[in-house]
């Protein structure tokens, strides 16, 4: 699964998460995203349970702290054997490099493959006016995202989380194997909710995203498996 469709499991606890997952065939090779709420509620045992079912896991905790703390936390994450995890590019090069080092050290200790480390650039809930007014960033939103992407690559990260609208610029300034994973995916029939730079699965594919993260269009669908299959079909229709 080189370019995955990742389902965001934005549920408050394991009971609701499991109820949702029971609607999928047991042999469906899902790639799921665990965010802060669910991980803080259920802890590392959740990761072990999902891995035992054969799921690939994106642990999205967006680490942002002093370098030593981030390195120690990433060492623990590395031991869990997840596939992707996240860190804030705004933390700077020393923090990013410390996180990458911790992730690899933890994976080595547990004898598992190291996770891909993806840097957060600007959240897809942030528009340019907000960024400039609230963060006192004077450049454009695409320029800020591209800057963070270059910093992430220089700091041992494997890719970034970004809107599909920024992929072309990022890929023009980074290596060919640098990943662009795209949240804020909404089918044409879906409401954008709080994602201000949302695109459809087909648009993301056309913009050469390396993976898409989809939450409510699947988790709140009347038939989640059917919604997942439709999004996956649209995503994979562009070659």
Where are these regions (language model features)?
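Hydrophobic faces of well-ordered beta-strands that scaffold small-molecule active sites
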Residues: 3-9, 32-34, 57-61, 85-87, ...
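Active-site beta-loop-alpha junctions enriched in small/polar residues
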Residues: 8-12, 35-39, 64-66, 90, ...
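Short, acidic/polar
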Residues: 12-24, 68-76, 141-151, 196-203
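Acidic (Asp/Glu)-rich catalytic clusters
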Residues: 19-27, 45-54, 75-79, 101-112, ...
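Metabolite-binding pocket within alpha/beta catalytic cores that recognizes anionic/polar moieties
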Residues: 29-84
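Glycine-rich phosphate-binding active-site loops on the catalytic face of alpha/beta enzymes
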Residues: 80-93, 184-187, 195-227
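C-terminal helical cap(s) of enzyme catalytic domains, especially alpha/beta-barrels
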Residues: 96-102, 106, 205, 218-239
């Amino acid at each position: 699964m080189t370019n995955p469709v990742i389902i965001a499991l934005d549920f408050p606890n394991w009971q609701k998460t499991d109820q949702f997952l029971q609607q999928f065939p047991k042999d469906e090779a899902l790639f799921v995203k665990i965010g802060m709420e669910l991980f803080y509620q259920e802890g590392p045992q959740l990761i072990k349970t999902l891995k035992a079912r054969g799921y690939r896991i994106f642990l999205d905790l967006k680490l942002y702290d002093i370098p030593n703390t981030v390195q120690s936390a990433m060492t623990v994450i590395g031991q869990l054997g997840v596939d992707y995890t996240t860190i804030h590019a705004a933390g700077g090069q020393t923090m990013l490099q410390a996180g990458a080092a911790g992730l690899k050290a933890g994976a080595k200790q547990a004898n598992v493959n190291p996770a891909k480390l993806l840097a957060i650039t600007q959240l897809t809930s942030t528009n340019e006016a907000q960024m400039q007014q609230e963060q006192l960033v004077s450049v454009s939103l695409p320029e800020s995202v591209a800057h963070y992407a270059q910093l992430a690559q220089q700091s041992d990260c494997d890719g970034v989380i970004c809107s599909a609208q920024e992929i072309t610029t990022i890929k023009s300034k980074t290596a060919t194997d640098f990943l662009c994973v795209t949240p804020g995916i909404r089918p044409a029939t879906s409401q954008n909710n709080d994602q201000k730079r949302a695109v459809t699965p087909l648009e993301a594919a056309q913009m050469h995203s390396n993976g898409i993260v989809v939450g409510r269009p699947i988790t709140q669908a009347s038939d989640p498996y059917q919604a997942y299959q439709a999004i996956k079909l649209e995503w994979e229709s562009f070659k």
